[in-house]
Amino acid sequence: MLNNASLKGHINVIGDGRCDSPGHNAKYLTYSMQNQDTKEVATVNVVQVTEAGNSNRMELVGFKRALADIGQTVSVKQVTTDRHSQVRKHMLENEKDKVYQNDVWHVVKSVLKKLRKATAKKECALLNKWTRSICNHLWWSSATCGGSYDVLKEKWISILQHVKNRHSWGGNKFVHKCSHSKLTNSKERKTKWIQASSPSYKALQDIVLNKRLLKDLKYLTNFDHTGSTEVYNALLNKYCPKSTHFSYEGMVSRCQLAALDHNAGALLPQATTKMGVARWNVAFPKHSKNWVVKPIKASKEKTYVHKMVDRVVESVKSDDTLLRITVPKLPPNIASTPKPEKSSIIASHRSRFHPY
């Protein structure tokens, strides 16, 4: 999977983990990393909960393994993930030679959640009309900061000026005015501006100037995304449905098949009609609650399937042994205590419905 990337000596990667069941009782976690340029899956690692101690630690274990796997083949220059605190701590303390970034979408999602919570209050209802613009402003700030944290921070905070109809100001080093063109009189009259003394403005200030958010902006300077890992995770549901138990070998095999399937379509162009017009699919995402269009890709040619079948047939004919999956030494049960004899459990069984 890394043959093309190895030609240039280093790659930027994006990573994400996926548990086999919702909540905090997962048995397996699958951690995948992709080449950021091609969106191809570079490595997939399966972690059983007994290897990490509990399900909350599995993502860090999977991340470390995936990064180590890729590091054996090529040099990793930059790593982009979600806002996982354990992964971030590991990168800042143990991988200082690599650039670390977060997916902008995850930060925007956090801001949106806070905005919706604030607008639920009657006195902050006006803020609801600005929610989409504020989130778009964070996207824009990250995309246009030129890799500078200081520029990104000033651009983000400038939303506090714009919402109260103030479009130029002093005191900053880089950003002194809004980037939009001069508003027409009609546009200015129709816009529901927020007064600086209002509860809505105070609530917005608390969100925009949140210390953790401002600190996290330094990981958004390269405007990176991990959306393609979600595409792989969605495809993985076909091969490895959640809340369905598989053996360790089964998990690894299914994840590898999903990776091959994903990579077969990663570089496909957008499909077109017979007249050469690009094809689009209309969708209504729940999070945005807006109709959007998404490109339809050309059909996959799963040539790897025929190669796999040919290899299996060839190995059977030649009595050759296929490469088997290496299974780590794992306890037969993920329970924290050894399984007792069935007879002793029956003997100690009591029911609240039949206590005697």
Language model features by range: what are they?
Residues F63-K64, L204-Q205, K211-R212, H262, ...:
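Short leucine-rich amphipathic alpha-helices used at interfaces
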Residues V79, Y100-D103, L214-Y356:
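Amphipathic alpha-helical/coiled-coil segments positioned at domain termini
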